[in-house]
Structures are given as structure tokens and as C-alpha cells.
């Protein structure tokens, strides 16, 4: 049995493109983390999520945990707590390059297979009216860095260097790792 330890509809949608059958069991692990390094922060939270669900299921499943963070100048931008915070985040990203890092942990037959994927994203210059119009859509409120590249937030992106799916929150490297672990990732 394969389990995705996430309630994210974006992660579910990407995984379903490659794996026909899996279960979704969101992790209840704490997402409080004082690790400042974006890569280590994302890896720690991914491990926590995977381990919590793996233990809850009695160590009888393959479990995928993932966590995505946006960072700029080494500072992590999480999910905005309110519209003003979303505005500040988007204003900070405006006209600048930032990093999107997804840490993942797959627990398969008792062994942890963990990694992190980093994608560079460059935003266009954004004026305040455009930022507020985007915030009013509600789209940025549940996303790290206050934007979703797969939605209206994609308008802000000038270029990316790396894995697009990583920016969405579920890098293709996870699918490749599942293939290496023996999962059929191409049958439908």
C-alpha cells in the first residue's frame, strides 16, 4: 500500500498522474520548526510527516511525506497568516529571484529515502494593485510564499530554472524514486 501523508490537492493530483492506486492520510505531525536553513527545514518536516503516518499505520505501508518552502536571501517564507502578510511576501518577491525547496521522505520497508529539490524562480516586477487583486482571489492564502505557479500566480513568474512540479509542491524526483523502489509509475 502506498500512502501520501498530505492533504494537498496539488500533491495528490501530481502523484495520480503516475500512480493509479494510493491512499491519502494527512499527517498530524507538528509543522513548527526552528531550523533556519530552507533545505534542512523542508527535509525535517517531510521526515516528521512520513514518520508520523508510517507509525500510525503500524509500519505496514510505503509512506511519502513532503514539505515545500519558499526562501529569498536565506529567509523562509511560509504560508501567509493574513492578507497583509501575503502582500508583504509578494512585494518581497517582486522583481527578484527566489528558491522553492521541497524536502521529501519516502519510508519503504522500514528504510527512509529522503532528498530535497531546489528550483529557482524569478518574479516580474509587480505593482501594488496587481498584488492586492491577486490576494482578493484567495489563491495565495494556503501556499508557501503566497503564490501558486499552477494558478493565477503563474502570471508573476518571469522564468524558472529547475523542476516546475517542485514549485507546485511535488517534484518529479519523488516519482523517479518510487520507480527505483519498484512502483509502476507508467501504467494506467
From Swiss-Prot:
Its EC number is 3.6.1.9. It catalyses: dTTP + H2O = dTMP + diphosphate + H(+); UTP + H2O = UMP + diphosphate + H(+). Keywords: Cytoplasm, Hydrolase, Nucleotide metabolism. The keyword Cytoplasm applies. One of its GO terms (cellular component) is cytoplasm. CDD domains: Maf. One of its GO terms (biological process) is nucleotide metabolic process. Disulfide bonds: none annotated. Its cofactor is a divalent metal cation. GO terms for molecular function: dTTP diphosphatase activity; nucleoside triphosphate diphosphatase activity; UTP diphosphatase activity. InterPro entries: ITPase-like_fam, Maf-like. Belongs to the Maf family. YhdE subfamily. This is dTTP/UTP pyrophosphatase. It comes from Thermococcus kodakarensis (strain ATCC BAA-918 / JCM 12380 / KOD1) (Pyrococcus kodakaraensis (strain KOD1)). The lineage of its organism: Archaea, Methanobacteriati, Methanobacteriota, Thermococci, Thermococcales.
Amino acid at each position: 500500500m502506498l500512502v501520501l501523508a498530505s492533504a494537498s490537492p496539488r500533491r495528490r493530483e501530481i502523484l495520480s498522474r503516475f500512480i493509479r492506486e494510493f491512499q491519502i492520510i494527512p499527517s498530524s505531525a507538528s509543522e513548527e520548526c526552528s531550523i533556519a536553513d530552507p533545505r534542512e527545514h523542508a527535509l525535517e518536516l517531510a521526515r516528521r510527516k512520513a514518520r508520523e503516518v508510517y507509525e500510525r499505520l503500524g509500519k505496514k505501508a510505503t509512506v511519502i511525506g513532503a514539505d515545500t518552502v519558499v526562501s529569498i536571501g536565506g529567509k523562509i517564507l511560509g504560508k501567509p497568516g493574513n492578507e497583509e502578510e501575503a502582500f508583504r511576501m509578494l512585494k518581497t518577491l517582486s522583481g527578484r529571484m527566489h528558491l522553492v525547496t521541497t524536502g521529501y521522505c519516502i519510508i519503504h520497508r522500514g528504510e527512509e529515502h529522503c532528498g530535497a529539490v531546489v528550483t529557482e524562480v524569478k518574479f516580474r516586477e509587480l505593482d501594488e494593485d496587481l498584488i492586492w487583486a491577486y490576494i482578493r482571489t484567495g489563491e495565495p492564502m494556503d501556499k508557501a510564499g503566497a503564490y501558486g505557479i499552477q494558478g493565477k500566480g503563474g502570471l508573476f513568474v518571469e522564468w524558472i530554472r529547475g523542476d516546475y512540479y517542485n514549485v507546485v509542491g511535488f517534484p518529479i524526483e519523488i516519482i523517479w524514486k518510487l520507480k527505483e523502489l519498484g512502483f509502476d509509475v507508467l501504467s494506467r
